[in-house]
Design a protein with these regions (language model features):
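Amphipathic helical "hinge" segments at domain boundaries
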Residues: 44-107, 112-115, 194, 201, ...
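Flexible loop/turn connectors
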Residues: 227-352
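Short, solvent-exposed amphipathic alpha-helices that sit
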Residues: 71-86, 161-165, 187-206, 221, ...
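N-terminal helix-turn-helix DNA-binding module of bacterial transcription factors
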Residues: 1-57, 351
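Structural motif
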Residues: 90-110, 162-163, 214-232
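Hydrophobic alpha-helical segments within soluble ligand-binding/sensing domains
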Residues: 154-179, 194, 219-228, 247, ...
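Flexible loop/hinge segments that line or gate small-molecule binding clefts
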Residues: 97, 118-164, 185, 205-206, ...
């Protein structure tokens, strides 16, 4: 049996070859269901190389992430992959938290891919510019650059996440609250800190400066930051940790120091994962939908590639929510109001 051609599909449905071609390229056309059925019945397989030569496209979309071992980025890539469907293949580039590798990778992508979904390492990164990219479509996800007004972005509501975490701990009676932050040079690190500090300020709580630890979004960084907190003469009674990998490291440090969660210290992490429910005790977290962020980024990018979206760049915000489990306990039962007032005063004195 000879191999089916695009002409065979068009003849079976009763449409032009150009209509079938547009359908295969992802455009909305009439008789889409009939075309899809005919392609399946005839086992038609488009010649991708020939099609790309004709359209001037590569059929590839690059997804650039800083650390693929982070479950959040793995889920984000999967969401983008599903949204791309059969039209595009994903070229995954893991920069390994290396700025030089990030610059190298972005330069090599020009002319090799049809678009880029990009998670930059730092807001101040100079790896890209409108001039260097030319007309290559790009969508930021999770993080943006300070000079990125010309590009679309899909971001979680990080400020709200930091605010929800701090507010929950305050409502449980905590006042000596520590914060293990990601790099303040990154969008999520900076915005989660803004939300956290806003919640404390609204309730008149002055944070001991020693309770703030800027880290690097890695497990080792979380371990080192928590170890530093545990070395203090007056330890915090609660901690918000600004990403999943740092939370793993921080929990390891707590275990090594025989600190009981939540009896000795309440813990809130950022990003939900299957293991969050398996940790003992199950982890309270700020949750966001990584699949959705990846899918929205891909959908936005495809609109740009196809020329459907001619509007100015847009920023899409994805909601976050607090998932309460058992790592914070029900109340800060081990501290009286008098003790809380004393620790607030002590924290204020430490700042002077």
């Amino acid at each position: 049996m000879s191999k089916a051609t695009i002409s065979d599909v068009a003849r079976k449905v009763g449409v032009s070859e150009s209509t079938v071609s547009r359908f295969i390229s992802g455009y909305k056309v009439r008789n889409a269901k009939r075309i899809s059925r005919a392609i399946k019945d005839l086992d038609y397989r488009p010649n991708i190389v020939a099609r790309n030569l004709k359209t001037g496209r590569t059929g590839l979309i690059a997804v650039v992430v800083p650390d693929i071992t982070n479950p959040f980025f793995a889920s984000l890539v999967r969401g983008a992959e599903i949204a791309a469907g059969d039209e595009y293949m994903i070229q995954l580039i893991n920069t390994g938290d290396d700025l030089e590798r990030e610059k190298w990778a972005l330069k090599r992508m020009i002319g090799r891919v049809d678009g880029v979904i990009y998670v930059p390492l730092q807001e101040s990164s100079e790896a890209i510019s409108n001039k260097s990219l030319g007309s290559l479509p790009l969508v930021f996800v999770d993080r943006v650059l300070t000079k990125s007004n010309g590009f679309d972005s899909v971001l979680a509501d990080n400020c709200q996440g930091g605010f929800l975490a701090a507010s929950h701990l305050i409502e449980l009676g905590h006042r000596a609250i520590a914060f293990i932050s990601g790099p303040l040079s990154s969008t999520p690190g900076r915005e989660r800190a803004i939300g956290f500090n806003k919640a404390l300020a609204e309730r008149g709580i002055v944070q001991n400066s020693q309770y703030f630890r800027e880290s690097d979004f890695t497990s080792l960084g979380g371990y080192q930051a928590m170890s530093g907190l545990l070395s203090l003469k007056v330890r915090p009674t609660a901690v918000f940790i600004a990403n999943n990998l740092m939370t793993i490291g921080a929990l390891k440090a707590l275990k090594e120091h025989r600190i009981s969660v939540p009896e000795d210290m309440a813990v809130i992490g950022f990003d939900d994962h299957e293991i969050s429910d398996l940790i003992d005790p199950p982890l309270t977290v700020i949750s966001r939908d990584a699949h959705l962020q990846g899918a929205l980024a891909m959908a936005t990018l495809l609109e740009r590639i196809r020329g459907i979206n001619q509007f100015p760049p847009k920023q899409i915000k994805v909601d976050v929510n607090l998932v309460v489990r058992k790592s914070c306990g029900s109340t800060c039962h081990h501290r009286s109001n008098e003790e809380a007032k004393f620790e607030d005063t002590l924290s204020a004195l430490t700042l002077t």
